[in-house]
Amino acid sequence: MMQRHAAIGSLLALALVSACKNEEPRGAAPPPPPAAKPAACAGGGGTLSDAQSAAFFPRTTAGFCLDPNGGDKTYGEGGSLPLDQICDMFDGECEIYKGFGVRRVVELRYVDGSGSAATIDVHLSKFGTTEGAYAMFTKRVVGDGDPAGEDTPRPIEGGGAAALGLGTAYLWRGAHLAEITYNDEAAAEPAIKALGDKLLAPLVKEIGAKLPGETALPPAAAALPEANRIPLGVRVVTKDLLGIPSTGGGAFGYYKDADKRYRFAVMVRADDEQAKDVLATLGKGPGAQKEKGIGDGAVRFMSKEGEAPAVEWIVARTGGRLVGIGDEVRVLRSGMTADEVAKVSLGKDEKIARLKDAIAKK
């Protein structure tokens, strides 16, 4: 009997061994991606196939080089790929780019000459106008957020304006916007930040010096008051800046004076008559009231964004330019008491005083 049990045990053991040999381990990690060649940059780096943008990018930068295997792609005007395919590249945000008038996009990358899998990925977009390119820059840097937030990119040197966030930099000049990202799946967030700061800032400065176009801001953004403005605290909106139909685009400026937060808004029109029409439209809203003694006419009204509390705006005209001052909705919340609102917002008289000062300086 014992011999029979031993034989059965041996057969079971053999069966288990055989089964283990035939089954793949479950939950095993996929094989790592192929590493870059240690001598990838030995030949001085690759070259770009897009003749329009090749001169903007150095072949080497801080131990990285343009991918010797090529792979750069051009979408839209003068490119081999249709512009609509940028939707795959920008995660479905192509309509935002199109709304700002994007004409072409070049995609390229730098590889690490030391052989790691790290890359510096670049998207260079060219827009139909300087205003469109700068508007997209401000959309990326500020967007719907608060430029005073800790996670907001900080200003760096380059082109007309540049910003550096966590492993990503943004560069604007003329009709161009460059978005430059340091990627390394093996690196933790602190390393991404440190290496991004080290690698991207000098690259942004170099590319910014080579891009064509003016570095002067579009007229509405340039007319924003500078005192108390938060670094990179500008947002250009090309359609209906204050959310009121038929009033057109312009620029917001974001400001902080001690605990007080507020915004300026500037809209520049072709002539006085167009500016008068905008002011008249603003004055037709529910509860809007005329204010005397400010510029060439002024109105006060309440504006509301989505679920956020309504905020007070006072907008004045001076020639073909409209300048407004309003509460900062990003620091307000539903249910705040009057005292809580007063701690972070300007009163009506304070708004009027700062508005008059802004008009007088421009």
Protein language model features and the residues they cover:
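Sec-dependent bacterial lipoprotein signal peptides
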Residues: M1-S18
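Soluble, non-membrane globular domain cores that form compact, hydrophobic packing
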Residues: C20-D121, S125-K362
